C-alpha cells in the first residue's frame, strides 16, 4: 500500500494514498480499533454532515465573503454533494466507539470535503478547519447531524413504511367485513368479533403510532449549529445560526430552524429520547400485531388455524413440509432490538455533564438503527406476509360455534350466575350450550334458538 504524509497540530501521520481523509481521521482510525468494519458511524450521520457542511459554507459565503470566497464555495458544494449522495462513503471509516462528542467524525468530514474540494479545484485551496469547519465546532455539528439524520430517518423511511402497512390493513378490513370469529382475551375464548374489527385494531394502532411520530419529530427540527464550542456562538458571525438553519431547510426541504437555546441543544438529548419513545411505541404495536398473526396462523391442524399466511420458505431442516411464520418472527426480533436501543438512548442522553453531552455517537447509532430496522422490518412484513393474509372461514366458524363464551348472550335472559352454570356444564359434559341450558331448565330449546345468534353479538 502506498502512503502520503499528512500533518496536524500533533505532527505528521502516514495516510493511505488513495484515501481522502487526513491526519486526525487516521489517528482515530488507529486509536479506536473497536468494531472496525462492523460498527461504523452510521451512513445517515455521514450524509447529514454533508448537508450541514454545505449549508455552513453557503451561510459563510454570505456572512464572511472575504474568507468563504465564491471559488471555495463552488468546490466545497460539489464535494459536499458527493458526501450526501454516498459517493465518498469509503472515505468515512471511523467507528461509533470514539470520542463521545463525535469530534473525530466531524474532522473526518472536514478532511474529506477539504481534500476532495482541492482535487476539484486542482490546487490546495481549502483547509479542513479554517474553511470546512468555519463558524463551527464538533460540539454543535454532531448534535446537528443527529437531528438532521433522525428527521430524515423518521419522515422519509419509517413513516412511509407504516403508511404502507396501514393501506394493506384497510384492504383486508374491506375484504373480511362479513366474517365473524371468536374473540380472545387472556389467550382464552371471549365474545365474538368481526375479523375486520380485529384488523381495524391493528390499523388504528399504526395510525396512532404515525401520529405520535409526527408529533415527536417536531422538536428534532431545531438545530444546534451556531452554538459552537459551549453554546455561546464563539467564532460564529452574527446571524449565522438563523441563516445556516435556513440553508439546511433549503437543502432538505424540511422545516429546520435554529434551536432557541444552544446551551440546551449541546448538552441535552431529550428530543432524541422523546422521538425514540415514539419509535419504541411503534415497535410495541408491531410486536402485538405480529404475535396476533402468528397465533391466528398457528397449526395447520393443531393450532388456531384461523388465517392463512404466505408460505415463503421451508421451515425446518428435519420436519418435512413445515412452514413457519418467519416474517412475524423477524419483526418481533426487531421490536426487541428497538426496546433495547431505547434503554441505550435514554442512558446516553443522561450523560450531559456541564456544557456537552459526550455519549452522542452511541445515542445516534442506536436511534438510527431503530428507525432503519423497524422501517425495513415493517416493509418486509407487509410485502411477504400481510398482503397475503386470508381468512380460514370454516375454521373461524367452527371455533366460534364451539366457544363457551357465547353464553354471554344469555345473560339478559337467565342471569350471569345461571349463564356461568350453563358454560361449566357444557364444558364438563362435552355438550353444547343449548343442550346444557335446556337440561338445567333455564330455557326451552325454542327460546334458546330465538335469543341465541352468535353473528349478532358483534
Would you name each region that the model predicts?
Residues 1-458:
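Conserved, well-structured ligand/cofactor-binding cores
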Amino acid at each position: 500500500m502506498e502512503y502520503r504524509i499528512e500533518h496536524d497540530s500533533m505532527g505528521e501521520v502516514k495516510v493511505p494514498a488513495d484515501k481522502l481523509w487526513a491526519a486526525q481521521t487516521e489517528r482515530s482510525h488507529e486509536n479506536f480499533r473497536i468494531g472496525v468494519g462492523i460498527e461504523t458511524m452510521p451512513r445517515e450521520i455521514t450524509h447529514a454532515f454533508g448537508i450541514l457542511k454545505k449549508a455552513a459554507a453557503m451561510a459563510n459565503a454570505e456572512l464572511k465573503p472575504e474568507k468563504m470566497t465564491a471559488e471555495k464555495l463552488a468546490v466545497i458544494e460539489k464535494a459536499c454533494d458527493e458526501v450526501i449522495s454516498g459517493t465518498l462513503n469509503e472515505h468515512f471509516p471511523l467507528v461509533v466507539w470514539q470520542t463521545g462528542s463525535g469530534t473525530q467524525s466531524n474532522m473526518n468530514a472536514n478532511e474529506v470535503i477539504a481534500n476532495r474540494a482541492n482535487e476539484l479545484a486542482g490546487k490546495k485551496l481549502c483547509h479542513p478547519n479554517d474553511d470546512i469547519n468555519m463558524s463551527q465546532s464538533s460540539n454543535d455539528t454532531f448534535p446537528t447531524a443527529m437531528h438532521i439524520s433522525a428527521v430524515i430517518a423518521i419522515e422519509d423511511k419509517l413513516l412511509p413504511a407504516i403508511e404502507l402497512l396501514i393501506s394493506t390493513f384497510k384492504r383486508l378490513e374491506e375484504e373480511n367485513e362479513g366474517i365473524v370469529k371468536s374473540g380472545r382475551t387472556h389467550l382464552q375464548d371471549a365474545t365474538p368479533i368481526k375479523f375486520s374489527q380485529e384488523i381495524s385494531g391493528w390499523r388504528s394502532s399504526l395510525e396512532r403510532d404515525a401520529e405520535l411520530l409526527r408529533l415527536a419529530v417536531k422538536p428534532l427540527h431545531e438545530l444546534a449549529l451556531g452554538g459552537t464550542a459551549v453554546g455561546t456562538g464563539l467564532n460564529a458571525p452574527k446571524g449565522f445560526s438563523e441563516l445556516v438553519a435556513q440553508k439546511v431547510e433549503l437543502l432538505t426541504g424540511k422545516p429546520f430552524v435554529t434551536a432557541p437555546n444552544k446551551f440546551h441543544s449541546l448538552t441535552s438529548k431529550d428530543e432524541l429520547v422523546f422521538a425514540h419513545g415514539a419509535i419504541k411505541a411503534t415497535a410495541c404495536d408491531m410486536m402485538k400485531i405480529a404475535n396476533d398473526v402468528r397465533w391466528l396462523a398457528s397449526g395447520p391442524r393443531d393450532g388456531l388455524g384461523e388465517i392463512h399466511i404466505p408460505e415463503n420458505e421451508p421451515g425446518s431442516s428435519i420436519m418435512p413440509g413445515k412452514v413457519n411464520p418467519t416474517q412475524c418472527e423477524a419483526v418481533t426480533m426487531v421490536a426487541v432490538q428497538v426496546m433495547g436501543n431505547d434503554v441505550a438512548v435514554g442512558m446516553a442522553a443522561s450523560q450531559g455533564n456541564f456544557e456537552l453531552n459526550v455519549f452522542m455517537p452511541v445515542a445516534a447509532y442506536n436511534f438510527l438503527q431503530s428507525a432503519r430496522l423497524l422501517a425495513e422490518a415493517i416493509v418486509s412484513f407487509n410485502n411477504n406476509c400481510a398482503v397475503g393474509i386470508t381468512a380460514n372461514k370454516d375454521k373461524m366458524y367452527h371455533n366460534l360455534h364451539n366457544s363457551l363464551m357465547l353464553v354471554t348472550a344469555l345473560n339478559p335472559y337467565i342471569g350471569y350466575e345461571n349463564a356461568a352454570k350453563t358454560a361449566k356444564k357444557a364444558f364438563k359434559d362435552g355438550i353444547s350450550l343449548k343442550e346444557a341450558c335446556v337440561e338445567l331448565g333455564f330455557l326451552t330449546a325454542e327460546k334458546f334458538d330465538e335469543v341465541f345468534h352468535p353473528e349478532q353479538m358483534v
